[in-house]
Amino acid sequence: MPTINQLIRKERKKVVKKTKSPALVECPQRRGVCTRVYTTTPKKPNSALRKVAKVRLTSKFEVISYIPGEGHNLQEHSIVLVRGGRVKDLPGVKYHIVRGALDTAGVNKRTVSRSKYGTKKAKATDKKATDSKKK
């Protein structure tokens, strides 16, 4: 522990917090343009074709971001909204594309966790029709 004289001569260093998503530059999300949309394979124990996109952000960063959900409508020059959040089994993928925002469509026929995939609530007419038949 330093003495008072040592603290007078040289004050304590401030702890610098390192962000896990530097390309967002202190913003919750950033807009960007897809420069390449492709699939890639995950790390060792897992096996799949994960959909990812290389995105040029408004902050001038070029990042690789994951496209969540089943199926997507993204192609080159699509405008997307990017949020933080890495994908554990894809090295170098530290961002997610927000579904249902800007050019990205929501996931079709999604019933559970719809808010995460930009899906509107299904029409309740089907449910009422089945309930009336039961009575």
UniProtKB/Swiss-Prot annotation:
Alphabetically ordered keywords of this record: Methylation, Ribonucleoprotein, Ribosomal protein, RNA-binding, rRNA-binding, tRNA-binding
Biased composition (Basic and acidic residues): 123-135
Renumbered residue ranges of the record's region Disordered: 108-135
A cellular-component GO term for this protein: small ribosomal subunit
InterPro entries: NA-bd_OB-fold, Ribosomal_uS12, Ribosomal_uS12_bac
Chain intervals with Basic residues compositional bias: 111-122
Key word Transmembrane helix present: no
Alphabetical list of CDD domains matching this protein: Ribosomal_S12 (cd03368)
A biological-process GO annotation: translation
GO MF annotation, one: structural constituent of ribosome
PTM sites of type 3-methylthioaspartic acid: 89
Keyword Iron: no
Subunit and partners: Part of the 30S ribosomal subunit. Contacts proteins S8 and S17. May interact with IF1 in the 30S initiation complex.
HAMAP family for the chain: Ribosomal_uS12_B
Family label: Belongs to the universal ribosomal protein uS12 family.
Function summary: With S4 and S5 plays an important role in translational accuracy. Interacts with and stabilizes bases of the 16S rRNA that are involved in tRNA selection in the A site and with the mRNA backbone. Located at the interface of the 30S and 50S subunits, it traverses the body of the 30S subunit contacting proteins on the other side and probably holding the rRNA structure together. The combined cluster of proteins S8, S12 and S17 appears to hold together the shoulder and platform of the 30S subunit.
Stated name of the protein: Small ribosomal subunit protein uS12
Species annotation: Helicobacter pylori (strain HPAG1)
Lineage start: Bacteria, Pseudomonadati, Campylobacterota, Epsilonproteobacteria, Campylobacterales
